[in-house]
Amino acid sequence: MTGLQAAILGGSALILLVLALRLGLQRHLPRRLFPALWCAAAVRLLLPVSIPTRLSIWNLFERTSASAAAGTVSRTLLPFPDLTDGAAIEAVLEAPARVSPLFIVWLAGTVLLAAYVSTGCIFMVRGFRSAQIAPCPSMDVLLDVFRFRKSPRIRATSSRRAPLTFGVLRPVILLPEGLAAESEPFRLVLAHELAHVKRRDCVRKLLFTVCLCLYWWNPLVWCMVILAGRDMELACDEAVLRALGPGCRKAYALTLLSMAARSPAPAPLTASFSGSSLSRRIRAIARFRPVSKWAGVCAAIVFALSACVFSTQAALPAPSGQEPVVPEPL
């Protein structure tokens, strides 16, 4: 199995594991756990290497063919081709390189999708450069609540895409111009965007976007990107309610409805106060209750063990009683 095949199979297996965990235990686990699990699946897709472990389920399939594989070692290494045959070497060098049509299709899809995302981000950033610095009298309190050491840049804009957060290295929070600085919606919207910055959701979206550009042909990756975006919003909702207390649930839900009514679809590579899966988010806010950290720890351990079983490759010991074949020097 090649490294690329291992990455595709391992990453797809992790996506299926997260889907199963999300389907069965989503209400009983911390919301912040699921974006982290999606990131683990994305990282596995971007690592084209084999990760052999003795826990891998592939060991069950490889053991049956271990003896056959050991018997073919000498045939794969020996005999060497006659490197002194000039005609053979010339024929190999002059053979035309053939490019697979599937590779051309994949490359075209990757380039088009990457160009679409990049163009959207460039136009978005250009439109936000003229945004004014927003007055933030409630900023210090929220920075202390979310334990920020340095304040992110906060600006006000007339764009309908606001509120949102963009920027990987230096995040910028964009708030709507119409929000009064001392109002409750201003405080709740700012808290939500600060949660995005604290959780580095723009970095996560960049990771998912790279995976989507490379694996656009894999429906599981599309599923991962869509659900990861929803889970990041749910995790930020949970972070706001944990920080400000369950007493703000009604005001927070009303603010979410008002912001979703004015905002279009979220821009790529941004974390926004969007209305994606609005009814699901409202229900989650209404049912919010603090979840024990131990539940998340136990789920993470189960996920890690399952990942070792399903997303790693077989680790076979060397065949006993056989000497390794060493090629003779030419």
Q: Residues of each region from the PLM?
A:
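Active-site recognition of the HExxH zinc-binding catalytic motif
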Residues: R187-R204, F208, C236-D237
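Internal/C-terminal transmembrane anchor helices
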Residues: R44-L47, R289-P317
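Cytosolic-side transmembrane helix boundary signature
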Residues: L14-H28, P268-C298
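Auxiliary, metal-adjacent structural segments of Zn-dependent hydrolase domains
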Residues: T119-L164
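Short helix/loop segments within enzyme catalytic domains
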Residues: P135-C136, L142-R149, K198-R199, C223-S279, ...
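Hydrophobic, aromatic-rich membrane-embedded alpha-helical segments
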Residues: L45, S50, G167, I173, ...
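Hydrophobic membrane-embedded segments
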Residues: M1-S118, R129-Q132, D144-S151, L278, ...
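Active-site scaffold of zinc-dependent metalloenzymes
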Residues: R161-S183
